[in-house]
C-alpha cells in the first residue's frame, strides 16, 4: 500500500529513513525510443542517499531496451539489494507504481504481462521478504519546480532523492 506522508524520526535524515523503513529512490530512462529496439539504449539508477556507497547507475541488461523496463528493473534491483530490512521505494514511474501495488496485494503476474520476466522476478523478491521486511511504494513527482514545493506536492528531500536516481 502507499505510504503515509513522511515523518522523519529525530536525528535521522529525511532521505534515509521514514517510519523505520530504509528509503530508496529508483529511476529509469531510455534514449532512442523512436528507434527499433536494437538501436535503443536504456539504464537505471538506485539512490539510497547523498554520496551513499550503494547508489547505482547501470545499463539495462538484455535486448529489450525501454524506459518502462529500466524503471521496473530499478525497483526489482532495489528490492533485492535490501532484503533484510523494511523498505520504502520512491519512484516517479506511474507504471511501476501501479504494477507494484498489484504485486503487494498478492497478484501473480502471468506470461502475458509486458516485461513479465521482470514482474515475476519482482514478485518473487517481494514474497521472499516476509512481514517484518515489507516493501512500501510511494509515487513522487518528476520534473519539479518551485510551485510544486509551495503547494506541498513534493518535499525538497524527495525531489533531491529523485534527482539522484535520475
PLM segments and residue spans:
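Metal-dependent nuclease catalytic cores that hydrolyze phosphodiester bonds in DNA/RNA
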Residues: 5-6
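RNase H-like nuclease fold core
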Residues: 9-85, 100-101, 159, 163
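A structural signal for isolated positions on well-ordered beta-strands in alpha/beta enzyme cores
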Residues: 23, 88, 136-138
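Short, charge-rich binding segments
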Residues: 78-82, 88-89, 124-130
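Acidic/histidine-rich, metal-coordinating catalytic segments
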Residues: 87-100, 140-143
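Two-metal-ion acidic nuclease core segments, chiefly of the RNase H-like superfamily
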Residues: 101-146, 150-152, 158-166
Amino acid at each position: 500500500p502507499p505510504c503515509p506522508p513522511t515523518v522523519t524520526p529525530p536525528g535521522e535524515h529525511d532521505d534515509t529513513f521514514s517510519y523505520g523503513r530504509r528509503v530508496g529512490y529508483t529511476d529509469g530512462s531510455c534514449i532512442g525510443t523512436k528507434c527499433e529496439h536494437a538501436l535503443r539504449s536504456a539504464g537505471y539508477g538506485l539512490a539510497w542517499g547523498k554520496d551513499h556507497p550503494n547508489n547505482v547507475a547501470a545499463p539495462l541488461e538484455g535486448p529489450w531496451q525501454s524506459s518502462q523496463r529500466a524503471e521496473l528493473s530499478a525497483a526489482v534491483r532495489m528490492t533485492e539489494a535490501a532484503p533484510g530490512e523494511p523498505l520504502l521505494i520512491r519512484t516517479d514511474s506511474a507504471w511501476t507504481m501501479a504494477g507494484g501495488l498489484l504485486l503487494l496485494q498478492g497478484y501473480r503476474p502471468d506470461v502475458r504481462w509486458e516485461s513479465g520476466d521482470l514482474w515475476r522476478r519482482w514478485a518473487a523478491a517481494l514474497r521472499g521478504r516476509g512481514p517484518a521486511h515489507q516493501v512500501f511504494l510511494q509515487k513522487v513527482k518528476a520534473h519539479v519546480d518551485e510551485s510544486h514545493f509551495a503547494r506541498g506536492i513534493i518535499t525538497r528531500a524527495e525531489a533531491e532523492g529523485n534527482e539522484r536516481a535520475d
